[in-house]
Design a protein with these regions (language model features):
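Short, non-ligating residues that shape and space the ligands of small metal-coordination modules
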Residues: 389-393
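Extended, non-transmembrane interaction/recognition domains
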Residues: 117-375
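Long, leucine/valine-rich, helix-dominated scaffolding and oligomerization segments
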Residues: 1-175
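Short cysteine-rich clusters marking metal-coordination/redox-active sites
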Residues: 380-386
């Protein structure tokens, strides 16, 4: 049974929250302290109903206030609430013409690196059609319906708020179920920051009849394709694992993606739910960012990787949020290139093996052997003119 915890900070500051935020905090604490799966389901349903109502009404402030409060006061309750919020923003049950549909916002991430510029932008009709066909053939369950946004997104172009994300989910879901083109504004998306290594995303929604599997790896002892399944959905066959689906996805979709990313190297990740793939792409891009920075400097400055020094320091306010890596040529005291290595989810400086060890290993693999680790935790600083992070040098 979970240990019951009482947070003095929550009681002392409760009056500063709106009633909606207070109810979210109470529900998250109830779920964190639950003693059974039956009680879990009660709290999960209560939280889901409140969160969906707030997001559908565009009232995200209460959600963010509750998350901020719990993030400072109760880590387990914060985890319960953020999981519920992410679920409400990426999934929904819609009823259309008397049929209930489970709908999920999904993404197919690409980890991309280059010495030049990583593209983002519109997919041609042929490219979008080919990519959609590969979703049906290698990722989605037999009875799934799917709608792909014909755009290769950068992280800067994805919806910034949980309410906006849920709005995109529902629009795409209606389109996937009904077949009409969705109304998604792609003309006013922001410019993309230039990075040597970054993630790109293909975004879509999968919809299935209530309770049916969404992905091929869920189809265990499933019957053949139903009459309502899309014409290009796969026929009945043996169960495919996640690994098999990923292997097939990479082999078949990569030729369609290569023309979208000229001059770039890239890896394809397994298409899956939106938020888990956001975290996975963040995790996977970190070592590529370090390698790309070293590769860029060795070519731009015509030197060997062994002639670079790395200065690594931890940054954060109340805890370590990220490590910053400054790369300094041996004939200079100035940082020539910097890389941010964020800590993700439950990661911390106490992990075994530690994130610092992972950073050291990537630097050594890239040929950088002179590595200095600063012991103290620093307040994050940014350039006053352009807002980019400031990186540690050797002094």
């Amino acid at each position: 049974m979970k240990e019951i915890r009482h947070s003095r900070g929550l009681r002392d500051r409760k009056s500063h929250l709106s009633p909606d935020a207070e109810r979210l905090v109470a529900g998250a604490l109830g779920l964190a302290n639950s003693g059974s799966r039956a009680e879990d389901r009660f709290w999960e349903a209560a939280l889901a109903g409140r969160i969906e109502k707030l997001l559908d009404g565009g009232h995200s402030r209460a959600v963010h206030d509750a998350l901020d409060r719990l993030n400072k006061a109760d880590g387990e309750a914060y985890g319960a609430l953020i999981e519920a919020v992410e679920d409400a923003s990426e999934s929904a049950v819609l009823e259309i013409d008397g049929q209930a549909w489970d709908c999920l916002l999904v993404s197919a991430p690409l980890v991309v690196w280059t010495r030049f510029r990583i593209p983002s932008g519109a997919l041609s009709a042929d490219a979008a059609s080919a990519v959609s066909a590969h979703w049906y053939a290698h990722v989605l369950a037999r009875d799934a319906r799917f709608r792909l946004v014909p755009w290769l997104y950068s992280i800067d172009q994805l919806p910034r708020d949980f309410a906006d994300l849920r709005k995109v989910l529902k629009r795409l879901a209606v389109s996937a179920i009904g077949g009409a083109a969705p109304r998604i504004d792609l003309k006013s998306l922001p410019e993309t920051a230039d990075m040597l290594a970054d993630a790109r995303f293909l975004l879509g929604v999968v919809a299935v009849p209530r309770g049916a599997p969404m992905f091929r790896w869920q189809e265990v002892d499933q019957p053949g394709r139903s009459a309502s399944a899309p014409a290009h959905a796969p026929e009945a066959g043996e169960h495919a694992s996640r690994v098999q689906c990923l292997e097939q996805w990479i082999a078949q979709v990569r030729p369609n993606l290569e023309p979208l990313l000229p001059g770039c190297g890239f890896e394809c990740l397994l298409p899956d739910a939106y938020h888990i793939n956001m975290r996975e792409s963040d995790r996977r891009v970190r070592p590529f960012g370090v390698r790309a920075a070293v590769h860029f400097l060795t070519h731009a400055l015509t030197l060997d990787a062994s002639q670079l020094h790395a200065s690594v320091a931890a940054f954060g306010s109340e805890r370590i949020d990220e490590y910053r890596i400054g790369l300094v040529p041996s004939d200079s005291d100035e940082v020539a290139q910097g890389v941010v290595w964020p800590l993700l989810g439950s990661e911390s400086e106490h992990d075994e093996p530690s994130q610092l060890e992972a950073i050291r290993e990537v630097l050594r693999e890239a040929g950088v052997t002179d590595i200095r680790i600063w012991p103290e935790v620093n307040e994050p600083e940014y350039c006053e003119d352009c807002g980019v992070p400031l990186y540690p040098n050797l002094k």
